[in-house]
């Protein structure tokens, strides 16, 4: 046999590396990153151009003449669910001054009471709170002398006495029995007068 070394192998160390011919070798399971290339004719973006800074979303710009439901008139915002406290209310029984017609004032419960102003006493106003005059004395204010009084009552023969008298005659009561209803005060009309000035106030009629 010859002692000469064998010829070099074509794929041996003297052959150019595969990476120099076609780049890095392909590794299974690994993909090279894709590079976005601009279309032909469009210049590349400059590296100095940065995206616009991020701005947090602010309040929408209202249209002229529109006030959002949570915005005050001066442009400040109120938190949701906030309601202004109610204004002061007048105490119970207080009636604010107003243009009421002469001769009447608002009474309790929304009723209108009658005002009696005697001649010569323009500075004194008497309000009668709708007293009910019946067959018993009533505490009231005299519209004539302007004093707090209890009325004085007197009985007078009225329509009910005559009706009951004719009814007795129809039933056959004679010899003066038909006059018995005229003697009973519970069937007579009641007249209320002032015990101080003796002035007439009201008459309660049993039968109108």
Curated annotation (Swiss-Prot):
Region entry Membrane-binding amphipathic helix, spans: 164-184
Matching Pfam families: zf-LITAF-like
Coiled coil feature spans: none
A GO molecular-function annotation: zinc ion binding
Keyword Metal-binding: yes
Residues binding Zn(2+): 142, 145, 194, 197
Biased composition (Pro residues): 1-13, 50-67
Membrane topology field: Peripheral membrane protein
Task performed by this protein: Acts as an important p53/TP53-apoptotic effector. Regulates TNF-alpha-mediated apoptosis in a p53/TP53-dependent manner.
Family: Belongs to the CDIP1/LITAF family.
Domain notes: The LITAF domain is stabilized by a bound zinc ion. The LITAF domain contains an amphipathic helix that mediates interaction with lipid membranes.
Protein name (Swiss-Prot/TrEMBL): Cell death-inducing p53-target protein 1
Organismal lineage: Eukaryota, Metazoa, Chordata, Craniata, Vertebrata
